[in-house]
């Protein structure tokens, strides 16, 4: 925003907290923690022998809390919300790293955050950065669904190297809400990964990039068309029209 990054960048699910960004006259941060019951469920998942994504993320979260020496039960019993009024965007970013940064002291215990910024371009808009619909933490997934049902536009990110694979298509088929969303934008991320996979037998980087930029839109058109037809047959005309 205004040429500055606000949210930390990371590819690991443990840092993917749901964040709402909106306009405010002064920089403001609200942190929402897991409830004691939600955290107990995460601890129970971490104790099991399963190697599922949900169990792996739970173990990572519990390990982070132990690493920072935090008494999770005491902290969460003190309330599920903490509010910080800060003097500048830079100060907000420094504070934010403690709660959503990859190595933040309290990152593992945070379910979602709300950020208010004094930026005129945000007036009348809300931006929701979500962990995605396949988030291994169930309570975050439900909150993502709730927000999506109120959004006008959804940006769906998919890695170029696995662009719209079966996992992505299953998510679109099963989780896209039938109300609220008026437009969906596909975003192909991590282009360098696709170039590395595609360029081993091509003469130049330019040729590789051209092929990737041609191949991905073609795949998107074909896969989305098939999904739209399937949703129409299942009696979901609104979803079919959105796609």
Where are these regions (language model features)?
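Globular "head" domains of long coiled-coil molecular machines
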Residues: 1-243
């Amino acid at each position: 925003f205004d040429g500055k990054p606000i949210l930390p960048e990371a590819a690991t699910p443990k840092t993917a907290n749901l964040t709402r960004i909106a306009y405010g006259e002064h920089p403001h941060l609200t942190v929402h923690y897991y409830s004691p019951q939600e955290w107990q469920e995460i601890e129970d998942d971490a104790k099991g022998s399963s190697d599922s994504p949900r169990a792996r993320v739970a173990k990572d979260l519990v390990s982070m809390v132990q690493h920072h020496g935090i008494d999770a039960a005491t902290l969460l019993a003190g309330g599920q919300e903490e509010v910080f009024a800060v003097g500048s965007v830079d100060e907000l970013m420094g504070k934010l790293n403690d709660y959503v940064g990859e190595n933040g002291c309290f990152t593992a215990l945070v379910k979602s955050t709300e950020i208010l910024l004094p930026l005129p371009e945000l007036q009348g808009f809300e931006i929701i950065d979500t962990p995605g619909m396949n988030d291994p933490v169930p309570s975050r997934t439900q909150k993502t669904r709730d927000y999506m049902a109120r959004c006008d536009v959804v940006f769906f990110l998919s890695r170029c190297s696995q662009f719209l694979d079966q996992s992505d298509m299953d998510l679109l088929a099963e989780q896209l809400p039938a109300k609220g969303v008026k437009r969906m934008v596909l975003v192909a991320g991590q282009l360098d990964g696709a170039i590395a996979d595609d360029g081993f037998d091509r003469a130049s980087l330019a040729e590789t990039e051209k092929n990737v930029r041609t191949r991905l839109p073609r795949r998107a058109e074909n896969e989305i068309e098939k999904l739209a037809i399937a949703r129409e047959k299942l009696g979901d005309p609104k979803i079919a029209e959105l796609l």
